Design a protein with these regions (language model features):
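Hydrophobic helix-and-loop "lid/oligomerization" segment in the mid-to-C-terminal part
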Residues: 1-132, 137-183
Length: 184
């Protein structure tokens, strides 16, 4: 690729593929991998620009309202309710995971999944030293196990009923603190 193009190295190529996959444009990602250029390249470039603009807008909305964001230097709690939804939350998570500012933090993100449930996503970032599986197991003991989904060693999702939210938030902070202490 051209050294000045937006696919100039493997990192930028991976970012473009990630954008395509997050937007569920697998055909576009495959075409790029197979070497198609021209209109495919323009479509990918437009998608990346749209993605970047969306992430900037979401970030500024979330972090402008101080009550939505709490950071104790080890864990970041973000209330994305009303801003993030199931369509854009995974792109936002990908952005947070790659952010240098959060590279050593456990990220706890809350969105409204439906009228009855919140989705609480916990992400262990690159330099965070906490046993996320241990947290998932403790949550499963307190709340209904069927609502805890281990995505991988670095990400879990919990569906919490609206009526159990306050109880869950109180317990999740205690569980995280306990897990940090037990690892020390």
């Amino acid at each position: 690729e051209e050294s000045e193009g937006f696919l100039k190295n493997t990192r930028s190529f991976a970012k473009v593929l990630d954008c395509c996959l997050n937007a569920q444009r697998t055909g576009l990602a495959l075409s790029l991998c197979l070497g198609d250029r021209g209109k495919i390249l323009k479509d990918a470039h437009d998608l990346v620009l749209k993605h970047n603009e969306s992430i900037k807008k979401l970030s500024s909305q979330l972090f402008r309202e101080k009550w939505r964001f709490y950071d104790n230097k080890e864990t970041v709690f973000i209330n994305g309710e009303g801003i993030l939804d199931i369509q854009n939350v995974y792109s936002f998570i990908s952005f947070l995971e790659k952010s240098v500012s959060f590279a050593d933090r456990l990220i706890c993100l809350r969105i409204l999944d439906s009228e009855e449930f919140y989705k609480f996503i916990i992400i262990k970032t690159k330099f965070c030293n906490i046993n996320l599986i241990g947290i998932a197991q403790k949550i499963s003991k307190i709340f209904d196990e069927e609502y805890v989904k281990i995505i991988n060693n670095n990400k879990i999702e919990i569906n919490i009923s609206v009526s159990n939210l306050e109880d869950f938030l109180s317990n999740i902070k205690k569980i995280i603190i306990y897990e940090k202490i037990s690892q020390s």
